[in-house]
UniProtKB/Swiss-Prot annotation:
Annotated Polar residues bias: 597-609, 765-774
SUPFAM superfamilies in the record: CAD & PB1 domains
Species of provenance: Oryza sativa subsp. japonica
Major site of localization recorded for this protein: nucleus
Regions of compositional bias (Pro residues) in chain numbering: 1-11
Residue ranges annotated for the PB1 domain, each copy included: 844-927
Alphabetical keyword list: DNA-binding, Nucleus, Transcription, Transcription regulation
A Gene Ontology molecular function term of the record: DNA binding
Compositional bias (Gly residues): 21-32
Protein name: Protein NLP1
GO CC annotations on file: nucleus
Length: 942
């Protein structure tokens, strides 16, 4: 059983403190030093000297320290052993008179030891280290006077004990303030510790060992956040009230061999160590030694033009997400090499694997976490570290329900997150059409009170929906893109081999762990976590062989200018959260080019159907079409709640039954196009096929009837049909009838801007008709005689549509179906010179146009049509007339809907009038490529 460090000693008496104060450890001159024998000989004669033999004590004469270390050790009070451990600890302590130090195997890499009587130290390096500490101490004293607290600076150097190479600070130069008793005691405790300096070690490194082997600095705002395995001195640090700490490697400038570690310990918490790091680096350079690179300006501007071009859109995304969901902080990370940003963790080997924040593209909504953002700007990350590093390294969105559970090696900023109270975080790697092969990761921190698993899942789903609405040039990166042209070379480790394995294996363990309290899962977004990604996944199921149906479901628009690519090939797999709840995750995806604009998918695509079936859950299989019909009268969200599924899952279930839109939402709106009404009728038929209005009209025109001949009535038994079918008359209201008025047109135009001679209306049945039965009888007026077979043929062609629409007539007696471009002739005339738009306005609406970070507000004049509105927006933003722009308005369900014609503007006005909102929000996007049939607008369930 591993023995822990002895518990801290009881408080000292005044006599003991007086004795300590008289030890003479105070100013810059009171520095203990030693001779580093043979160092100059090794450096001059052997450029590639063996580090394991370099620090081996020689047979030189004993060193002459500035004060007697042995006497100081006996004067300083060390932690007393616990009861019952006196004899055991005394037996395990190394002998003072022995030639070497006997290491107790029970301590596994670090032991308590007394100060050796002989330490071989090379004078030249010793002198350089002593002068460097003098400069560090001089700067540190001025910082202490500014309120940064008192400091202890000590050096850890490697030495060989038996067959092991360890780091020790015993007998090495150090500096501390003589007035601070706690730091003096902590110095004595540190001299009794040894840490492994072997690169093959995977544990027992401690803070000095990690810095020495990893060759990168490490700092923390409070060492008390460490675990005992990460920081064996943590119990002593807690007792002596040690807080902040920073450790930097010391290199020989020519051979780049690591000579040791400089550790700075303070009695106050500290978040930003840039001044201390720069101070230590400059002091070492003055004595011809070197440490990590000095940090560059933390507000370094992005030098890549493509990144600069995307910053406004990123800021729109971050601002919208944080303001909508009350997130405290959102940050953008890109590779350091892309913005020429230097940092203290950089080296020539690791620079290309390091990522840092783009400070111009970060949004701090809660000022209390500003310090954490500054720490992130200062502390760069390697691939695999934290959710950001893992998102860069794996090309997968990464979510952590509690980032404070990461170890220091897994997430170097975990202590800072704990200090500022941050918990859950999610990172998503994206790419813009403006940035080419350059990638970035958006990191969002969930509200501090959002700790429940269900709350976090709901929050992630909401975040993804908001991102979908705001982004217009962003897309997810393909896996091959990360390997072929990304800034990282995945095959090469970013850190020494021992360190890379430690990080990645631990993270993989976290991702696959089940019911491990406090551990973090790499949650790849799913339909419940990322609905905008789920929309992409579902879209590919409708197409085949690289051709994707442009009519995407659930309000997702696939135009290239919006930036979201249609994806396929996601591999979903369940991942367990810390509490055992199940998340679904995706692994990878592939992009498919949109080659053709089609209005329906290929029903013969059996392979796609089989792939979808494999991913269906038990809940989805048990929800039948009949069960869905019972909930058509309400909203989609209400139906999802009643069925016990989330809205996104319900949308998938609807698509499996051939339902492309949720009917009730469109029934409630007035002024929709005939194309959209066709989709409502299509959606209730089932997966085998859909009823086309065009085929219904063809049956009318294929008969020998003419419009003039349809004057009489032919009544059919109620047992055959339950509703009336009669031609509509332009000046008569259509009540309780499924009507069709034809004039040489056999099909419905798909464009909302194209005029048509056909109109379709459906409303509630008067009570006078309901008195004769549960539903009215079918009647067709005509002037000529026709046999029963001809009538039967006509009825069969319309029976499918009637059977499904009957439910809507009965359950929603006050609802009215109308087309957007073709309203009922009894209420409106055809659209001419925007007369309908003028009639629809009872008063003028305000337009709030958004173009990047710019905003403008103006009144919508009654005489304006779509083209005039577009010209006004272009003029106000100073956009070139040659630049093609797309306009989108925010509808009553918080979806961005394309605005392409006068009919769309009429629809927009109706939506805002019905919601009593007098300000129309319009998003202005530059179009990358011409739109494909833009008049179709926003489609799909929502």
């Amino acid at each position: 059983m591993e023995q822990k460090p002895s518990p801290p000693p009881p408080p000292r008496s005044d006599e003991e403190e007086d004795g300590l104060m008289g030890c003479g450890m105070g100013g810059t001159g009171d520095i203990a030093g030693g001779d580093l024998d043979l160092m100059e000989e090794f450096l001059l004669a052997t450029p590639g000297f063996d580090l394991s033999e370099f620090w081996h004590p020689g047979a030189a004469s004993p060193f002459s320290p500035l004060f007697d270390i042995g006497s100081s050790v006996t004067t300083l009070t060390t932690p007393a052993p616990a009861a019952g451990e006196d004899d055991r600890d005394e037996a395990e302590m190394p002998s003072r008179g022995g030639g070497g130090l006997e290491v107790s195997p029970a301590h596994r890499g670090w032991t308590f030891q007394t100060a050796p009587q002989e330490v071989a130290v090379e004078p030249t390096v010793k002198e350089r280290l002593r002068r460097a500490l003098e400069r560090i101490a001089s700067q540190s004293q001025s910082q202490a006077q500014r309120g940064d607290g008192e400091l202890l600076v000590q050096v850890w150097v490697p030495t060989r004990i038996g067959d092991r190479q360890v780091l020790t600070t015993c007998g090495q130069p150090f500096w501390l303030d003589r007035r601070n008793q706690r730091l003096a005691n902590y110095r004595t405790v540190s001299m009794k510790y040894q840490f492994s300096a072997d690169e093959s070690a995977r544990a027992d490194l401690g803070l000095p060992g990690r810095v020495f082997v990893g060759r990168v600095p490490e700092w923390t705002p409070d060492v008390r956040y460490f675990s005992t395995e990460e920081y064996p001195r943590v119990q002593h640090a807690q007792y002596f009230d040690i807080r902040g700490s920073v450790a930097l490697p010391v290199f020989e400038p020519r051979s780049r061999a690591c000579l040791g570690v400089v550790e700075l310990v303070m009695t106050t918490q500290k978040v930003n160590y840039s001044a201390e790091i720069e101070n230590i680096c400059n002091a070492l350079k003055e004595v011809d030694l070197r440490s990590s690179d000095v940090s560059s300006d933390p507000r370094s501007k992005v030098v890549d033009a493509s990144y600069r071009a995307i910053i406004p859109e990123i800021m729109d995304v971050l601002r919208a997400v944080c303001d909508t969901h009350n997130l405290p902080l959102a940050q953008t990370w890109i590779p350091c090499i892309c913005q020429a940003k230097r940092g203290s963790r950089h080296s020539d080997e690791s620079y290309k694997h390091c990522v840092s924040t783009v400070d111009e593209a970060c949004y701090v909504r809660d000022c209390s976490v500003l310090g954490f953002h500054q720490a992130c700007s200062e502390h760069h990350l390697f691939r695999g570290e934290g959710v950001v590093g893992r998102a860069f390294g794996t090309n997968e969105p990464c979510f952590s329900p509690d980032i404070t559970t990461y170890s220091k090696t897994q997430y170097p900023l975990s202590h800072h997150a704990k200090l500022f109270g941050l918990r859950a975080a999610v990172a998503i790697q994206l790419r813009s059409v403006k940035t080419g092969s350059l990638d970035f990761v958006l990191e969002f921190f969930l509200p501090m009170k959002c700790i429940n698993t269900e709350e976090q899942r709901a929050m992630l789903n909401s975040l993804s929906n908001t991102i979908q609405q705001v982004c217009y040039t962003l897309r997810v990166v393909k896996p091959k893109e990360l390997v072929n042209d990304g800034p990282f070379e995945i095959s090469q480790p970013t850190r020494p081999e021992f360190y890379a394995k430690s990080v990645h294996e631990d993270l993989d363990e976290l991702c696959s762990g089940i019911n491990v309290p406090g551990r973090t899962t790499s949650l790849e977004a799913s339909e419940e976590v990322s609905s905008w990604i789920a929309s992409l996944v579902d879209a590919q199921n409708k197409g085949g062989k690289g051709e994707i149906d442009v009519d995407l479901p659930f309000g997702f628009s696939k135009q290239d200018d919006e930036g979201f690519s249609v994806t396929a090939g996601w591999h979903t797999s369940p991942v367990m959260a810390p509490d055992g709840s199940m998340f679904s995750g995706f692994k990878r995806h592939e992009d498919y080019d949109v080659k053709e604009n089609t209005c329906s998918s290929d029903p013969s695509n059996s392979n796609s159907d089989k792939a979808v079936e494999k991913r269906r859950t038990k809940t989805e299989k048990t929800v039948s079409l009949q069960d869905l019909r019972k909930h058509f009268a309400g909203s989609l969200k209400e139906a999802a709640k009643n069925l016990g599924v989330c809205p996104t899952t319900l949308k998938r279930i609807c698509r499996q039954h051939g339902i492309n839109r949720w009917p009730s939402r469109k029934i409630k709106k007035v002024g929709h196009s005939l194309k959209k009404l066709q989709m409502v009728i299509d959606s209730v038929h089932g997966p085998e096929g859909t009823v086309q209005l065009s085929s219904l009209y063809e049956n009318f025109t294929k008969t020998t009837w003419s419009e003039r001949e349809l004057q009489g009535d032919v009544h059919f038994p109620a047992s055959e049909q339950n509703f009336q079918l009669e031609p509509s008359v332009p000046d008569r209201p259509c009540e309780g009838r499924f009507t069709s008025h034809t004039s040489g047109s056999n099909s419905i135009s798909p464009s909302c801007s194209q005029s048509s001679n056909s109109s379709l209306g459906c409303s509630s049945v008067p009570k006078t008709q309901q008195q004769h039965g549960s539903a009215p009888q079918l009647a067709v007026k005509e002037e000529i005689s026709m046999d029963e077979n001809q009538c039967s043929t006509l009825i069969k062609s319309a029976s499918h549509a009637e059977a499904e629409l009957q439910m809507f007539v009965e359950e929603r007696p006050t609802m009215l179906f109308r087309s957007q471009s073709q309203v009922l002739l009894s209420e409106h005339k055809p659209i001419e010179n925007m007369s309908n738009v003028q009639k629809a306005r009872s008063d003028s609406l305000k337009i709030k146009a958004i173009y990047g970070e710019e905003r403008c507000i103006f009144r919508l004049q009654p005489s304006w049509g779509f083209q005039r509105l577009k010209e006004e927006i272009v003029k106000r933003f100073g956009i070139s007339q040659d630049t093609h722009v797309d306009l989108k308005y925010l509808d009553d369900e918080s979806e961005w809907v394309l605005l392409t014609c006068d009919a769309d503007l009429l629809e927009c006005i109706d939506v805002y009038k019905s919601s009593s909102n007098q300000t129309v929000r319009i998003l202005v996007n530059p179009s990358i490529q011409p739109l494909l049939n833009a008049s179709f607008g926003q489609t799909g369930l929502s």
